[in-house]
């Protein structure tokens, strides 16, 4: 390790010894000129010097930055004799910027030290005052004790000696007067002392307050200076492009030296350029003074125009740095609005979306998810706005703070089509609802409640056809117990498996009713084995599911099924709030021609009364009338009771929640908000076009479309039929539901069908008189159905008629060339023997040589014994002339075929 003296170090670095000693002292090292300096001390000195000069290249954090600036300009002065000359003027400026944190730390440290010193002085003064008070109190006690002792001794002497009483009394009075004067003097001294202490304390507090204010003022000045410096640094950083004539010197910084060299080089290049003319100098002088500048055109040019003086031109440039901010995004947003929130141009947003694979325009509505991805891609923080505050406020304003009471179970009857679900329910209700359903199959959700000896049960009867998947799912979601009806002769079928999946997804217990046990081919054990494959295990096998063998036709074990249902409900301990505002679910809805929108609502909690204001999805209204499943008028309905309500503004969607609210105006606002949000979200999803789908969309132009206007009696049927028809679409024919709704067929539907070249399908509905006239006038295809099987089959037939036909080539004859003749009219004539089938005139043919097709064309001439014939059968000779072909050789085969059109169907 090499060590030098301070003097040697000063000679080595070229610094005076006194200056070096001062720098060492500032760095915390007191040295003399003859002391040794180690490498660690050198490093410490270097770090201190870097810190003093604001160098950030080392480990020390810079605290100061010194900038030098030179500005050159040209001034035109009068040189006498009417001449002027240009004088170069150079202005040099030097500024030192101190880092904000260092100033704040120093001010804070000074304030802390001052506060500590004041606290120590205050503690010291308090200790001195306490000691002084103790000394004074001790002196006072000693004086009192001494006076007391003297008085006692005097009294004792008076009693003992019995001397002259007058002299003693006089002495006593003198002593008392002296003691009194001493006490008064002490009181005066104590008051003076306290007054002096109070004055001193006030002076100290005033000094302390002034010191704190001075410290705070210095701190604020330092903070303001730091903020100003920060703004200047930011401005200098942003305006780097305007610094060609500016020279910055940052000491001990490599990057600063490089910038300095670059600036000098540019300055030298500028100096070599041609000097400005006198007119340009005057123009620049006018610009500096804010005077007008006139640009005059040449000969024949336009007149000059006054340009704005420099003082009137704005000096603000658009920031090149994109401001990162929080972007609030709602359910949907327009592309231009999203760009405004991010403070960028809409074209930038569209570019980002195109890179992400989404095509959009400036006025297009995009959904929340897409907008969030775009904003995060551009570096912004996204805040998703909750727009349903009014909805939550309306739904939370309810008076359901009542005690829950036991309620009846809601049981859903599910199973495969024609397994006896409705028949089982019929026997329970002692009615014949199945005969009222077209084709004997259930096509709606029937909601009924029945009274048994052990209690009330509410039943939901769901369709078993494959088209009614959504209706079965809704039935499972709104239920407490699922009764799975399985025919003992058929076993497990596709809709049986689907019902099991719905029940498991809803998390409700499953009771299996094995029906049709009265049939000879019934096999209940086989049903158990098949259901065990889907984790439906009977209790006797150690499972959790109860099995009941019933016969809906004869009523066997129906009572046992009801007891099993009530037993399962008792285990579940089903409760609900009976009083208060009602809430439930829309099981089914339809548009009645005489009564308007009708919704079947299953009340789940509270009591629904006539006159209540009900909010159902996008619809609302006051309950004008309520009917039970039989059709009787009722005034109220409690939990687990299904009722039909009238008075809604429109037909609600099946599965919507029905809630009683207080204010009709707020209910209307919530319904309108839901409808608007539904439209916006639907539009945003429809307009979402991906780049990867562009070519498939182009190819879709060749696809035939079957447009359909669908009307049905209830909402569930519309949903089921539309879903089934949409699934019929193939690559060649697409089913397009241009319009659907609940209720009869109106003239509006006919106009829509005419405009879109569609057919009208009515399911359990009819067209009114005006609609029939419009349909006949436009020759629109109108069809009525009451069974969903027939509707789907006929739509398949219509789609089959739109398929492009297939063509098949069938070989009808084969002839062998035995000889070739020349004809002046027809050219080469092949003398042939028909070996297979028959040969027809004007039929397409192929010429085969060594079983290889060498020509395909048309048979032009067919003769037998110089007579033209239409056809020649197998085993006969004939002459064949091939159209536009003369290279027929002996041994060739002529194959005759015909093209057959094959009719295609939709499977």
From Swiss-Prot:
It comes from the Bacteria. Residues 28-44, 101-248 have a biased composition (Basic and acidic residues). It is found in: Cytoplasm. Residues 415-422 are annotated as: G1. The lineage of its organism: Bacteria, Pseudomonadati, Pseudomonadota, Gammaproteobacteria, Vibrionales. Signal peptide: none annotated. Residues 299-308 have a biased composition (Basic residues). Residues 26-317 are annotated as: Disordered. Residues 406-575 form the tr-type G domain. Belongs to the TRAFAC class translation factor GTPase superfamily. Classic translation factor GTPase family. IF-2 subfamily. One of the essential components for the initiation of protein synthesis. Protects formylmethionyl-tRNA from spontaneous hydrolysis and promotes its binding to the 30S ribosomal subunits. Also involved in the hydrolysis of GTP during the formation of the 70S ribosomal complex. InterPro entries: DNA-bd_dom_put_sf, EF-G-like_DII, EFTu-like_2, IF2_assoc_dom_bac, IF2_II, IF2_N, P-loop_NTPase, Small_GTP-bd. GO terms for cellular component: cytosol. Residues 461-464 are annotated as: G3. Residues 551-553 are annotated as: G5. This is Translation initiation factor IF-2. It holds the Pfam family EF-G_D2. Its main location: cytoplasm. NCBIfam families: IF-2, small_GTP. Residues 440-444 are annotated as: G2. CDD domains: IF2_eIF5B (cd01887), IF2_mtIF2_II (cd03702), mtIF2_IVc (cd03692). Keywords: Cytoplasm, GTP-binding, Initiation factor, Nucleotide-binding, Protein biosynthesis. It comes from Vibrio vulnificus (strain CMCP6).
